[in-house]
Amino acid sequence: MKKFSVVIAGGGSTFTPGIVLMLLDNMDKFPIRKLKFYDNDKERQAIVAGACEIILKEKAPEIEFLATTNPKEAFTDVDFVMAHIRVGKYAMRELDEKIPLKYGVVGQETCGPGGIAYGMRSIGGVIEILDYMEKYSPNAWMLNYSNPAAIVAEATRKLRPNSKILNICDMPIGIETRMAEILGLESRKEMTVKYYGLNHFGWWSDIRDKDGNDLMPKLKEHVKKYGYVAENGDTQHTDASWNDTFAKAKDVYAVDPSTLPNTYLKYYLFPDYVVEHSNKEYTRANEVMDGREKFVFGECKKVIENQSTKGCKMEIDEHASYIVDLARAISYNTHERMLLIVPNNGSIENFDSTGMVEIPCIVGSNGPEPLTMGKIPQFQKGLMEQQVSVEKLVVEAWKEKSYQKLWQAITLSRTVPSAKVAKQILDELIEVNKDYWPELN
């Protein structure tokens, strides 16, 4: 069985140790000969890499390991690039959230003006990594789960149309894990789903078990009362702010009881509620910096100090095993059915053919083959057309360095009440993003 060489782009991420543990747990399905970390923040990466090197020595000493800030070293001789980068780190995420909130607008990592700001920072970073991969390992595939996935996917479609990149998001997986629990199933893989939308902006229209029995009525009964709140939930989304999001799904569901919604629709359909329940001084970014970031870096430092993982509390990110499913589908032509973000090309009959949609695909050695979704209802179509236009305008603004188009993008977001407020937020975002955005004219 071939052994693979993998580079993790974003080696200094708080998610990296959990993903490394997950890869080690799946070595029987996806054997690795070489694992590399790449990051442009040497100090930050050194802490995570130092701990991961010890984890590897203990669990899989045969794997060759390297952490580097040198693109040539990182991207030469790799089969897969697994990318989770955060340009500007959590300090910039904090501003993405707090600046819009100052104006009474949703402040969120991937939705509204904050998501647009993050997108403007991320496009260049993801394109750069893609270019390194194509230069040094032209046969490799990039598995990208960097946020904001919708804008990043649109950017790769428009700016690098022939590149071997698969854009995937873990949010539907987290929700499906909860659905499986609500239904009393062992795993979300016992369900076959139909889902359509944009990234962080979609709906389940059909969910069946392996025998073809319709599971929607039972799920709807639960969601109508409790949202996606479940006993155990998924391992990824556990904080108090997430619990509110899963509970609020019942109100999002009520707007269209014929489908089951992605939780992120709360930000677009109930922005007033979101702002009202936000703390302008302490946002999700603060929660993460004080929670996961301190925890992960604290644990990594302990592992390095003890030169051992004994007593280490870092856990496998089990729900990240979708990354292995995707790599296996490409490597072994497994024809796994997965939700990916792909050009619509008529899959949704009555929607923009160039829009990047999130739909089920059959994945094999040549990449994804999107399934046909047919026509979608007017309500979803209307919301999606507005949102896909936001995403396209952001990418055009980045490419053309256009102030006008970015103002239009923010104005068009459902989360923003007027062009005046959009301009105020934009001008403040430009100030703080000088080191990250192209200079707009």
UniProtKB/Swiss-Prot annotation:
Impact noted for substituting residue 169 to S: Loss of activity
Keyword terms of this UniProt record: Carbohydrate metabolism, Glycosidase, Hydrolase, Manganese, Metal-binding, NAD
Residue positions of the active site: 170 (proton donor), 264 (proton acceptor)
UniProt effect for mutating residue 170 to N: Loss of activity
Annotated site, Increases basicity of active site Tyr, chain positions: 109
Expression induction or repression: By maltose and other alpha-glucosides, except sucrose.
Protein origin, superkingdom: Bacteria
Subunit structure: Homotetramer.
Identification of the protein by name: Maltose-6'-phosphate glucosidase MalH
Species: Clostridium acetobutylicum (strain ATCC 824 / DSM 792 / JCM 1419 / IAM 19013 / LMG 5710 / NBRC 13948 / NRRL B-527 / VKM B-1787 / 2291 / W)
Lineage: Bacteria, Bacillati, Bacillota, Clostridia, Eubacteriales
